UniProtKB/Swiss-Prot annotation:
InterPro entries: NA-bd_OB-fold (IPR012340), Ribosomal_uS17 (IPR000266), Ribosomal_uS17_bact/chlr (IPR019984), Ribosomal_uS17_CS (IPR019979). This is Small ribosomal subunit protein uS17. The keyword Glycosyltransferase does not apply. CDD domains: Ribosomal_uS17. GO terms for molecular function: rRNA binding; structural constituent of ribosome. One of the primary rRNA binding proteins, it binds specifically to the 5'-end of 16S ribosomal RNA. Pfam families: Ribosomal_S17. Belongs to the universal ribosomal protein uS17 family. GO terms for biological process: translation. One of its GO terms (cellular component) is cytosolic small ribosomal subunit. Keywords: Ribonucleoprotein, Ribosomal protein, RNA-binding, rRNA-binding. Part of the 30S ribosomal subunit.
Length: 87
């Protein structure tokens, strides 16, 4: 039971929802440079399984690591934290 809690959980923004049951989530993290101490922003895109096709472009979502679902999908959608406002 504790191994489920060891899985990585990230919060990111949906940048693509064109695939069926899959969204691409951009996760931004900050790391401190060892020598200079400056915070540097890193970003990475993760393909995420969205069973109900509920996440839309621009939504802020929480994703969790899971077993490999396809050649590129290793995460699943946990919840939609904030829905995007389309003007």
């Amino acid at each position: 039971m504790s191994e489920r809690n060891d899985r990585k959980v990230y919060v990111g923004r949906v940048v693509s929802d064109k695939m069926d049951k899959t969204v691409t989530v951009l996760v931004e993290t900050y790391k401190t440079h060892k020598l200079y101490g400056k915070r540097v922003k890193y970003s990475k895109k993760y393909k995420t399984h969205d069973e109900n096709n509920s996440a839309k472009l621009g939504d802020i979502v929480k994703i969790q690591e899971t077993r490999p679902l396809s050649a590129t999908k290793r995460f699943r959608l946990v919840e939609i934290v904030e829905e995007s406002v389309i003007i």
